[in-house]
Design a protein with these regions (language model features):
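Membrane-interfacial helix-loop-helix connectors in multipass membrane proteins
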Residues: 1-8, 77-106, 158
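Long, hydrophobic alpha-helical segments
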Residues: 9-31
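Selective transmembrane-helix segments that form parts of the transport pathway or gating/packing helices
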Residues: 21, 26, 53-80
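Transmembrane helix boundary and interhelical loop/hinge segments in multi-pass membrane proteins
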Residues: 26-47
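A structural motif at transmembrane helix-loop-helix junctions in multipass membrane proteins
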Residues: 31-33, 92-141
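Junction motif at the cytosolic side of a transmembrane helix
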Residues: 126, 172-192
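Extracellular/periplasmic helix-loop-helix junctions in multi-pass membrane proteins
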Residues: 128-135, 149-168
Length: 192
């Protein structure tokens, strides 16, 4: 019975909570990268570099994505280590994560990180501070909270099919958001 409860926690409850990590890490990095440089007046120096505005945009996006993914993977390893140690201590058995975790780590985490970065970049043109840019990306957490509530009430059950669908929708949304964010990344908007 205990092992079933641990399996439920690992494979059904933790994924919904886990999706918040890349949103938070990526949006903090993106806000610091875009708005933070304008606040510290280091953006002008960067714009004098031989890189094009498109290359600067891509580098900042990749930096935010890399930080989000590193934080996600380290958090996943720590969570798995702690949960496995507890399951082993209490039941004497090991617990394997479901295949859903593979979809989450390889498809949904990068997609949700890119969505957070795109929202942060779009809002950074209007934001006056890093905190203001970060606060706008918080709205991405609301659907995750709805997913958590759905999990606890039994309305939504996370499974591989739902995760694949969510991943495809997020990837399509990312393409649209990134196109819009790239369009708002101009010299005039950055310096104003």
């Amino acid at each position: 019975m205990q092992q079933m409860i641990f399996a439920l926690v690992l494979n059904n409850i933790m994924p919904a909570f886990f999706l918040m990590i890349p949103i938070m890490a990526s949006s903090v990095m993106a806000a610091s990268s875009f708005v933070g440089e304008r606040e510290k007046h280091s953006l002008e120096t960067l714009l004098y570099s031989p890189l094009s505005i498109k290359q600067l945009f891509q580098a900042k996006i990749l930096a935010g994505l890399a930080v989000g993914m590193i934080v996600s993977y380290v958090s996943f390893a720590a969570m798995l280590l702690v949960l496995e140690a507890e399951v082993l201590f209490l039941t004497g058995n090991m617990l394997l994560p479901s295949a859903s975790w593979l979809i989450i780590m390889l498809l949904i985490d990068p997609a949700i990180s890119l969505a957070a970065i795109a929202v942060t970049v779009r809002s950074s043109a209007k934001a006056q501070s890093v905190e203001e840019a970060q606060q706008r990306a918080v709205f991405l957490i609301f659907p995750i909270i709805a997913l958590v509530i759905g999990q606890f009430t039994g309305i939504i059950l996370i499974n591989s099919g739902l995760l694949w669908g969510l991943g495809v929708v997020l990837a399509a949304l990312d393409a649209l958001l990134m196109r819009g964010a790239a369009g708002s990344f101009t010299y005039e908007k950055l310096l104003s």
